[in-house]
Amino acid sequence: MKASDVRAFTADQLKDELAKLKKEQFNLRFQKATGQLEKSSRINEVRKDIARVKTIARQKAAEVKA
């Protein structure tokens, strides 16, 4: 997911996307623990996507306050 794609989201969409990514991260961690994970790089991708969404959400919140 690119940052430019995330910037187009509304605040509600950002919250939904964050919840979806956290759920996916949980499932990936569970798969890793049980030895069923095929693409271990996906864990890092999801982690970075979560950081991207959180960062842009903070930036949008700061713009509203300013």
UniProtKB/Swiss-Prot annotation:
GO terms for cellular component: cytosolic large ribosomal subunit. HAMAP family: Ribosomal_uL29. Keywords: Ribonucleoprotein, Ribosomal protein. InterPro entries: Ribosomal_protein_uL29, Ribosomal_uL29, Ribosomal_uL29_CS, Ribosomal_uL29_sf. It comes from the Bacteria. CDD domains: Ribosomal_L29_HIP (cd00427). Pfam families: Ribosomal_L29. The gene is rpmC. This is Large ribosomal subunit protein uL29. Belongs to the universal ribosomal protein uL29 family.
